Amino acid sequence: MRILITNDDGINAPGLAVLERIASALSDDVFVVAPESDQSGVAHSLSLSDPLRLRKISDRRFAVKGTPTDCVIMGVRSILIEQKPDLVLSGVNCGQNLAEDVIYSGTVAGAMEGTILGIPSIALSQCYEAGTGGRSGIAWDCAEVHAPGIIKHLLETGIDPDVVINLNFPACPASEVTGLAVTAQGRRDATTIKIDPRQDGRGLPYYWIAFARDTRQPGVGTDLEAVAQKRIALTPLRIDLTDDPTMTRLAQSLPKTLPKVAG
């Protein structure tokens, strides 16, 4: 089985090294094509105005000056064009990709691009608690220990062609995980996102996008609830964003001819 791995934290990120070990536990045919620098939050962006620069690190490791989406396309349509991957893995992200995070996530986008290209794809993210050492105290062993078995089972069961799997590992050591939950995508309180104004040394303003802690109870059956209970959240996401009930309702309610505005 040929595996292509990527991420959004960059070629030197510790989570990518974790994912290389996860992939190596499943296959000896593993290729890495990852961004040259941190691409967190770039979502599914594609480089159309700048050329892609490819740096070959070794026969199986490459860095691309581009986004996670660029990396997957480069891997599938160029580096591995003679024999495309059987699986795309994206991650392991340093931090959660839960709820509406999936809209912004380069990690999830890397897996989505794999799915669009017709390859079973999985995004992996390792949660951490900001108040307990933050990134420096992240429990990478949680993903490293549990991911291989979950991925193997998913491949045996089969992943639908229009679906990308989003895995989030709770902020705890592997030994403290309480189980695996198949979940729905959650929803946070939108008021938690804010602008944090600052001032530089010359007195000029600059700004950070910041997030406050969401104090609401997570929805039942969601990815947010699962990781709060120290369970691994497995969320199937669709590439097709069509809302079928709304499509049906509007098709039935709108007139067959173009409505005219009185004026």
From Swiss-Prot:
Belongs to the SurE nucleotidase family. PANTHER family: 5'-NUCLEOTIDASE SURE (PTHR30457), 5'_3'-NUCLEOTIDASE SURE (PTHR30457:SF12). It catalyses: a ribonucleoside 5'-phosphate + H2O = a ribonucleoside + phosphate. Keywords: Cytoplasm, Hydrolase, Metal-binding, Nucleotide-binding. It comes from the Bacteria. This is 5'-nucleotidase SurE. The gene is surE. It is found in: Cytoplasm. Pfam families: SurE. A divalent metal cation binds at D8, D9, S40, N93. The keyword Endoplasmic reticulum does not apply. Binds 1 divalent metal cation per subunit. GO terms for molecular function: 3'-nucleotidase activity; 5'-nucleotidase activity; exopolyphosphatase activity; metal ion binding; nucleotide binding. Gene3D superfamilies: Survival protein SurE-like phosphatase/nucleotidase. The keyword Metal-binding applies. Disulfide bonds: none annotated. Its cofactor is a divalent metal cation. InterPro entries: SurE, SurE-like_Pase/nucleotidase, SurE-like_sf. It comes from Beijerinckia indica subsp. indica (strain ATCC 9039 / DSM 1715 / NCIMB 8712). Its EC number is 3.1.3.5. GO terms for cellular component: cytoplasm. Nucleotidase that shows phosphatase activity on nucleoside 5'-monophosphates.
